[in-house]
């Protein structure tokens, strides 16, 4: 009995750990084609799709499959062709690059087909004529150039040319309703109406006065608020109900905001380049750290440069986390809990 008590005492001196993992990492050693991931999507089958520096990867929860993008016999794999990945309302995957090449995923043949490419002879002096590409709710892909917006209809494959009267480099777009849009640029933000193949700018003093390089926009249709992410100027909110601009007190001014993603009805996740992930309450505008690198922890977050963020149905947060690759945070688990005997405290282990 004395020996047994001695061993029991020694065991209780050692830390006990709860083995539930909060974070999981997917890197090149697991099959990811490149550590630099630009976009994350999830299809209706449940596959995760990653647009990387090398091409497109599909992940089934265990294995990766890499897809090549082909223009005839030539593989399209330069940085100018790997820029945006979208899923439309029918669940079809689209990839678009700054050269204006549009690829559509063919589920039957399990490959990406080139369905449109911008006539590059018109842009001989511009190696990357498209500053931003975007898929709207009206089945159009917007290929935004400083002078022209090319609208590619995903159903008819027809392309409409629209004059870009903003005359600034478009960086992001959010749709308000059938014909109204918020358009972010290198210089600021605009309110516009697209009708009869004409983009009409609508004067909005409060928005026009915001002078900042816009990186990401998120419009919450329920509460009619636009969340504005900038380069080194923090976050701003435009409230359409009160026609006012709000600048939260605790702001992220020294880092670049890369992405907003809804976490729930009341909170948005904010991905940053250098500051990890924060969250903002959509009513109070309080900003708090959510997923930030902890290099001293065995199972903590291990990077703060986040290109994209995706929240799935199981509340897992998928992060494009350079230079790691993909980091998955599972909110349903906590990190390691260290339990150890406190010497002199009879109530402790």
Regions found by a protein language model. Name each.
Residues 1-349:
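Carboxylate-rich, polar loop motifs that coordinate divalent cations or form catalytic acidic clusters
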């Amino acid at each position: 009995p004395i020996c047994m008590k001695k061993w029991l005492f020694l065991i209780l001196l050692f830390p006990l750990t709860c083995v539930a993992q909060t974070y999981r990492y997917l890197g090149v050693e697991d099959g990811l084609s490149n550590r630099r991931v630009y976009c994350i999507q999830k299809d209706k089958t449940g596959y995760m799709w990653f647009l990387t520096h090398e091409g497109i990867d599909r992940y089934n929860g265990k294995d990766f499959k890499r897809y090549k993008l082909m223009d005839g016999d030539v593989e399209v794999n330069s940085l100018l062709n790997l820029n945006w990945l979208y899923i439309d309302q029918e669940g079809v995957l689209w990839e678009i690059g700054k050269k204006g090449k549009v690829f559509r995923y063919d589920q039957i043949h399990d490959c990406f087909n080139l369905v449109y490419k911008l006539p590059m002879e018109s842009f001989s002096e511009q190696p990357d004529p498209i500053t931003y590409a975007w898929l709207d709710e009206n089945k159009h892909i917007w290929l935004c150039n400083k002078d022209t917006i090319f609208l590619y209809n995903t159903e008819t494959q027809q392309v409409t040319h629209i004059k870009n009267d903003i005359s600034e480099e478009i960086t992001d777009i959010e749709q308000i309703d059938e014909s109204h849009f918020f358009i972010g640029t290198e210089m600021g933000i605009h309110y516009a109406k697209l009708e009869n193949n004409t983009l009409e700018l609508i004067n909005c003093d409060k928005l026009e006065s915001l002078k900042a390089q816009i990186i990401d926009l998120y419009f919450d249709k329920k509460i009619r608020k636009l969340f504005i992410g900038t380069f080194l100027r923090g976050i701003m909110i435009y409230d359409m109900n009160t026609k006012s601009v709000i600048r939260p007190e605790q702001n992220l001014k020294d880092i670049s905001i890369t992405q907003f993603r809804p976490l729930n009805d009341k909170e948005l996740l904010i991905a940053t380049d250098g500051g990890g992930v924060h969250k903002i309450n959509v009513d109070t505008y309080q900003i708090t750290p959510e997923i930030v690198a902890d290099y001293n922890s065995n199972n903590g977050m291990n990077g703060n440069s986040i290109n994209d963020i995706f929240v799935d149905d199981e509340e897992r947060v998928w992060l494009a986390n350079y230079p790691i690759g993909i980091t998955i945070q599972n909110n349903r688990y906590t990190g390691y809990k260290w339990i150890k005997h406190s010497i002199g405290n009879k109530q402790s282990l």
